[in-house]
Amino acid sequence: MRMRYLATWATGLTLCAGLPLSQPALAVTVPAQNSPSAENHALLLQRLGHAHWVAQGKGPHVLYMIFDPNCPYCHVVFDELQPLIKPMGATVRYVPVGYLTESSLGKAAAMLEAKDPLAAIMKNEREFNMEHFGGLREILPSSATEKALEKNLAILRATGQSIVPTLIYRSRQGKTVVIRGGLDTRDMRSVLRDIAP
């Protein structure tokens, strides 16, 4: 499986692509020091159920995707998911966070405060480019939206690492699976097949 990672520093955005990993696509990635135990990973799904997310699809297989509007790898995963959602019976719940760049928070807020949040996410991804990243214009978030985004970011941090995209789902074996970084289309199909109905 090939995974692509996004690393961030206080100075901005740094990308590191094409890192080969020996773990299978369905494995929980190697936890970092001070990362949550498997029991805490199970609690992630409960927390995600109360997070501020935007759903696409109506299938029984629920996949959470924590993403930043300005994340290039999130954009790639978003594009890889589009042709698979309906035929594979998936519901993707997009959980926006805003921390990668100065405009990330405002763009994430624009998504959550839009009249049609899914249409806002689609516009952000359709107009994504490497000069300005996400295609939405940033807004000044309301205090309620800022709190919602802080809550979403706290869930991302509870995975043990603040890497986007992070995919989370319950497997057919009843385990909570956390995948950090991007997947290629073949691996994405395997993930969607592994999600419990």
Label for each model-derived stretch:
Residues 101-187:
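Thiol/selenol-based redox catalytic cores and closely related redox-interacting motifs
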Residues 1-4, 68, 116, 129-131:
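Poly-acidic low-complexity segments
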Residues 2-104, 140-163, 183-197:
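Extracytoplasmic thiol/disulfide redox context detector
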